[in-house]
Amino acid sequence: MSYSLNSVIINPSSKSNPKNAVILCHGYGGDGNDISILANYWKNFLPDTLFVCPDAPEICKVNPAGYQWFDLMDQTEEETLSKSLIAENKLNKFIDEVSNKNKLSFNNIALVGFSQGCMIALQTALKKKDQIKCVIGYSGKILNIKHLNQNINSKPEIF
């Protein structure tokens, strides 16, 4: 099954159709393969869960072997926000694809993010009109609190 973002896909260990999906968003300069290590640990505890680990949409400017959700280098806060909105749209589309292709409700989808992946996961999930189950964030932050406060559409659980 292909998606708009190149992805590492770990199918349910139960071999059945997925009942849930976890989308894992890597950090700045990483890729889906890096963060798929978590999925390989978690799959035994969540046997009916599909794990999808996309590569961010841009080649990383600092580490061309990896990817970035948006550029962080030498920009104003407004430029960073503008670029993050592009990544947000791509991740939002990706979430919709995972839902549609696997016949899952949004309430059965979780986002996990590390570092920059946490930033884009929080921004996307809180602004998404169709509420997902939750966001689990590691070592991240809210990118632009003013923008986010003005655009919250849903309130998934956040861990």
Q: What positions do the PLM features span?
A:
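Serine-hydrolase catalytic machinery in alpha/beta-hydrolase-like enzymes
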Residues: 4-104, 108
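The feature captures the conserved acid-bearing segment of alpha/beta-hydrolase catalytic domains
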Residues: 13-14, 140-159
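Alpha/beta-hydrolase-fold catalytic nucleophile elbow
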Residues: 54-55, 112, 136-139
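A conserved short beta-strand
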Residues: 130-142
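Gly/Ala-rich beta-loop-alpha elbow adjacent to hydrolase catalytic centers
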Residues: 112-117, 121
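Active-site signature of alpha/beta-hydrolase-fold catalytic machinery across serine-
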Residues: 37, 123-127
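Hydrolases whose catalytic domains are alpha/beta-hydrolase-1, hotdog thioesterase
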Residues: 120-124, 146
